Amino acid sequence: MNPNSKHNTNFTNLLKPSDSDIKQFAAQHICRLTDLLNRYAYEYYTLDAPSVPDAEYDKLFRELEALELNHPELKLPDSPTQRVGGEPLAGFAEVRHEVPMLSLTNAFSPQDENGVFDHAEMYAFDQRVRDGLDGGNPEYVIEPKFDGLAISLLYRDGVLVQAATRGDGTTGEDVTQNIKTVSNIPLRLHGENTPELIEVRGEVLMLKADFVALNKRQAENGQKPFANPRNAAAGSLRQLDSRITAQRKLHFFPYSVARQQDGFVAEEHIQELAYFQALGFSLPNGNFGCFKNIDEVLAFYEHMQQKRPELPYEIDGMVVKVNSLAQQHELGFISRAPRWAVAHKFPAEEALTIVEAIDVQIGRTGAVTPVARLQPVFVGGVTVTNATLHNQDEVSRKDVRVGDTVVVRRAGDVIPEVVRVIFERRPMRETAVAVSDGIGHRQDDLFAETPSANQTQSVPLHKPYRLPTHCPICRSEIEREEGEAVARCSGGMLCQAQRAQGLIHFASRKAMDIDGLGEKQIEQLVAQDLVRHFADLYRLDIPTLQKMKETADKTVAESDQMPSEGSSVGASGKHKKQPVKWAENILAGIEASKTPELARFLFALGIRHVGERTAKTLAQAFGTLERVRRAPEPVLACLPDIGTVVARSIAHFFAQAEQQAMIDELLAAGVAPQTQAVTIPPARHAEPQRWIARLPGFKISENKAQALWELAGKNIEGLQTDKALPTDWQAWRSEPQNAALLENLKTFFAQMPSEDEAAQGSDGINKAVAGKTFVLTGTLPTLKRDQAQSLIEAAGGKVSGSVSKKTDYVVAGEAAGSKLEKANALGVSVLSEAELLTLLG
């Protein structure tokens, strides 16, 4: 074919878009971006409820800027590149700014995987400044870019007369009355030489601590919490009732003078900041400075990025300004921002990504946490692939599903979390729906005379997420107690995820108090599968401990080419194991822990809801481990400070065959908890009408329970067999589990000492101490506070933290304070340590 023929077809030209096609595409894209960015700006500035992170807005804004630069004729009148912020809310008087409140151009310094910043945009800013100053060498001031609300304060003759929000940069809202409630804004300027007029620009914000306190109050009052401190500050400042604003504890930092008449005239911005302080304003001291060149500025920026999580307020970058006000004037402005300043943003702490899967993690305490597995996204200086979903309630509230596009936040060292779902990007599928055919028939009606038109509707591709019913590690049931947000694996020490924490608690000072065995050694023993259960600690020996240490030190020992501690090198060069003191100390500590107080042993078991105080109550009520193991749930629920939830937890623990086997192993290993004096006899607290009223599945008041007890002849056997008792009771006792519970109660009470036997000291009770309330104050000569408390409680006494008329004795040591004074005022007996020991016998 002749290449010069006019009929020759150039397929490349056919596929290449024409200029008109490109222009049409650009026009459509500009229109879409303008609408989208205006909607996002409305959400951010007007509703105070942004739906996308700042980084997403910035990316789209730059895309629109680039398109408008290439096609200036296509720029729309409402393009966000031509204005600042959003329109003011209704409800406040409008204020027109004599000097427009402009925003700043953004600059970014992205980090690579090693945390190294790319400061190319800041070096370009520095070069533009130098070019604008004909090669001059500018100084820069760098200060925090607060994440709050821009405010303009107008003072006449030193008195605050007006406060206005930025609004759209030209017109804002009059919030004078609300601003007057901000405690660190001077209502009258300080100093003698105050200007006749000065307009101060700055940022209103909420400190992190005040934000936490506010959200706590919101939750307590059943109100919706704020998403972040900026939203809280904006919402507080826009309250029509200034009394509400006053309760919110807002804060203000100034950053520029918009206009001024008379008074001190600064030549540099750093002088302006000092002038603000002289007038009575607060400054972010220690977090701003003046530097001679851009490299010093960037070093301070990196320092502040590291310091950011420790600051008392939220910042999302640093503002860099030319220090000389004359140079600022020379550089001037572009359409929407000054040429002499830039907002140097920190790496994004929020980003968009997709949820690829949701599974659960089991924590060291058994807490079950749903975790979103994410498409990798770079946020907060690191690549994030996982984010916490906290608990089932949070998953349901946010409605996070597999496939969703979500906003992920990572701030400092905080664990990444899913903030919200972008619902318009949720993957959907089409499904057929039954519809009317227009004459009364449905599409699924077999008798329809005419078929209906097919119709479909969009539904989410994935179902709502629900926690699994069993632990993925040990297959134990996952349980969630009523009123608690966190679900937990019920496996305890049976679950490998909980094993290390359980052993650390078991060996801790307030539990078994195993001297020499710390967290590090326990974690190494568990990691190497040398210890699985509590009893395994009592089977440890020197070779096992040496193996643990040698394995843990292997990498270090190899790199240093030195023998690890506890070994020696013979003539052959081979390592020979030798007994070492550290291992002997651990074994000695384990041996010494074999006869713990009963309360310590019970606390060491790690029973859910059983802290030190509850463990002591159990010991004082039952006296021996065997009685505690067999205590029925209704009896437990009658004891002081033990309600239904705690009683159920204790009974559930001892009802598990695995937990009973674990205790039997400890006893077989030589652990022998001491017998405790019974000072809270169940017969006194678990009176028949009380435990009957707490029987599971049988609702009855204590008064009616008392009547039932009397009808049964005041004995459990009557409750079991008397056929004259009410039919609802007979129906309840006929259930096998309930019949077994009654038999257990009968056996249990038969083996417990009576109240009289307990009072006579059959369990070794000290009559002079039993039932008495003691308060400890000051430093005792020889006893530590917890030692004195243990001695008193072992003798049947009770230790309280405060002095009252019900206090029997105050034990006072050196530097006793107000408790001793109150004891003397109330006439309470005061004992020295020696007198206490005498009383204890």
Curated annotation (Swiss-Prot):
NCBIfam families named among the record's database cross-references? dnlj, PRK07956.1
What family does this chain come from, according to its entry? Belongs to the NAD-dependent DNA ligase family. LigA subfamily.
Instruction: Show the Gene3D superfamilies listed in the entry.
Output: 5' to 3' exonuclease, C-terminal subdomain, 6.20.10.30, BRCT domain, DNA ligase/mRNA capping enzyme, Helix hairpin bin, Nucleic acid-binding proteins
**Gene from which the chain derives:** ligA
| Top-level taxon in the UniProt lineage | Bacteria
Q: Tell me which UniProt keywords the record has, alphabetically.
A: DNA damage, DNA repair, DNA replication, Ligase, Magnesium, Manganese, Metal-binding, NAD, Zinc
GO cellular component annotations of the record: cytosol
* Keyword DNA repair belongs to the record: yes
Name under which the protein is recorded = DNA ligase
This chain's source organism reads Neisseria meningitidis serogroup B (strain ATCC BAA-335 / MC58)
